[in-house]
Structure formats: structure tokens, C-alpha cells
């Protein structure tokens, strides 16, 4: 896996090409990502980078977290994220180093991971795009019902994994192959074409596209 960055969704806007074509873009702010730990095969059994970003009030940090940040010699951030490294990746990166948007200067496409917007408890029509039942023709109570979920005597039960009503959203989602429109090093911004998961100010993980 490639080295990525932790950013924050600012919102959406649009930019224009030289030909006057409007491109919808999502603006992602990437403050400096501080390396808090470098995991190795010898000490941890796998290779990875652990980073933090942003700030956190001192009274909201546990003793364990405070000790971990102090050991790395970095300012406490709002969270910890880990990125696996393949052989040969991350060479020369040490604890305390800071990663910024410049690492995406030559990147064409990225995968963006975030937590989708929570929708609460939803029915099958909204959650799974089920077709509604007849509005008339004798149907007066089950317009948006899931319908038959257990068949008849055989099998006479509901299979595991059956799409039904339930909690929708608020889960980790990755949008793949988003085109990088612009990298603004001065303002620590990345502009990607299209939408990314989650609400404004939500944390995002940006990595070079796996399928590019």
C-alpha cells in the first residue's frame, strides 16, 4: 500500500478549464501529517506509518496518548491513523517527520476514504433501492414493505445477509479513482473531481489510487 495523507473535507465548489468547461471539485484541506510511529517487521511484524494531524485539547488526551505523543516528540493530534507500507516504501521517513500535500504533486488519481453521512433507521426502499409495491389494486398497507423475506415452507427462514430495514450510513466508504485537479502547496489544499464520502469537516484518508 502507498503512503497517504489525512485531510479534512472543506466542501465542494467548481473550477473552470481554459476552454470554459465547469468541473465540480471537492476541496480537501491537508494540514501537516506528523509521523508518530514507524512500525517495522522486526518490532511489529509488519511495516507501517502511524500519523496524526490537527490539535487536541490537553484535557481531552489520556495518559496513554500523552505518553505516546511525547515518545515521538510530536504535538498531540485529533487522532491516530496507520498506513501499511510495502517493501521499499517509506524509506528515510523518521518519527517526527511531517508529510504534506507535495507527495501528491505527481499523482493523477486517488482513492478517498471517509465515514458516510448517517441516515438513521431506514426502510428497504431508501436503504437498498427496493421497488415499491402497488399503490392501489387492493394494497392499502404494504406500499413500502420489504415483501416476502423468508419464502415459503422451503426454506421457511430468512437467510443471513438479507437486505432489510436497518441503520443506514455512518460507515467507512471509499470512493476510488478520483482525478486530482489541483494541488495547492501554499494553502495545503487538494482539489479532486467529484464528491467524496462524509459531511463537511469530516476526516478523510487520501491515497494514490489502487486501480489507476
UniProtKB/Swiss-Prot annotation:
Sorted alphabetically, which InterPro entries does this protein's record hold? Ribosomal_uL3, Ribosomal_uL3_bac/org-type, Ribosomal_uL3_CS, Transl_B-barrel_sf
Q: Which stretches are transmembrane?
A: none
Fetch the Pfam families from UniProt. Answer: Ribosomal_L3
Q: List the GO molecular function terms.
A: rRNA binding; structural constituent of ribosome
A GO BP entry is: translation
Keyword tags = Methylation, Ribonucleoprotein, Ribosomal protein, RNA-binding, rRNA-binding
SUPFAM superfamilies, from UniProt? Translation proteins
What HAMAP family does its record include?
Ribosomal_uL3_B
Family to which this protein belongs: Belongs to the universal ribosomal protein uL3 family.
Q: How does it assemble?
A: Part of the 50S ribosomal subunit. Forms a cluster with proteins L14 and L19.
Instruction: Provide the function of this protein.
Output: One of the primary rRNA binding proteins, it binds directly near the 3'-end of the 23S rRNA, where it nucleates assembly of the 50S subunit.
Question: What name has this protein been given in UniProt?
Answer: Large ribosomal subunit protein uL3
Q: What is the lineage of its organism?
A: Bacteria, Pseudomonadati, Pseudomonadota, Gammaproteobacteria, Alteromonadales
Q: Point out the gene that encodes the protein.
A: rplC
Amino acid at each position: 500500500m502507498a503512503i497517504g495523507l489525512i485531510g479534512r473535507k472543506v466542501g465542494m465548489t467548481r473550477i473552470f478549464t481554459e476552454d470554459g468547461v465547469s468541473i465540480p471539485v471537492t476541496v480537501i484541506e491537508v494540514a501537516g501529517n506528523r509521523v508518530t510511529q514507524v512500525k517495522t517487521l522486526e518490532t511489529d511484524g509488519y511495516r507501517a506509518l502511524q500519523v496524526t494531524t490537527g490539535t487536541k485539547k490537553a484535557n481531552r488526551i489520556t495518559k496513554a496518548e500523552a505518553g505516546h505523543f511525547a515518545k515521538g516528540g510530536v504535538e498531540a493530534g485529533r487522532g491516530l491513523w496507520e498506513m501499511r507500507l510495502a517493501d521499499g516504501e517509506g524509506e528515510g521517513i523518521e518519527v517526527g517527520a511531517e508529510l504534506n500535500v507535495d507527495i501528491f504533486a505527481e499523482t493523477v488519481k486517488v482513492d478517498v476514504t471517509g465515514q458516510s453521512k448517517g441516515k438513521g433507521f431506514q426502510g428497504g426502499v431508501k436503504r437498498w433501492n427496493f421497488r415499491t409495491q402497488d399503490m392501489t389494486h387492493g394494497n392499502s398497507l404494504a406500499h413500502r414493505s420489504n415483501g416476502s423475506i423468508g419464502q415459503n415452507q422451503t426454506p421457511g427462514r430468512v437467510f443471513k445477509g438479507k437486505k432489510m430495514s436497518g441503520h443506514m450510513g455512518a460507515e467507512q466508504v471509499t470512493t476510488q479513482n478520483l482525478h486530482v485537479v489541483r494541488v495547492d502547496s501554499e494553502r495545503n489544499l487538494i482539489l479532486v473531481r467529484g464528491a467524496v464520502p462524509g459531511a463537511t469537516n469530516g476526516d478523510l484518508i487520501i491515497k494514490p489510487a489502487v486501480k489507476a
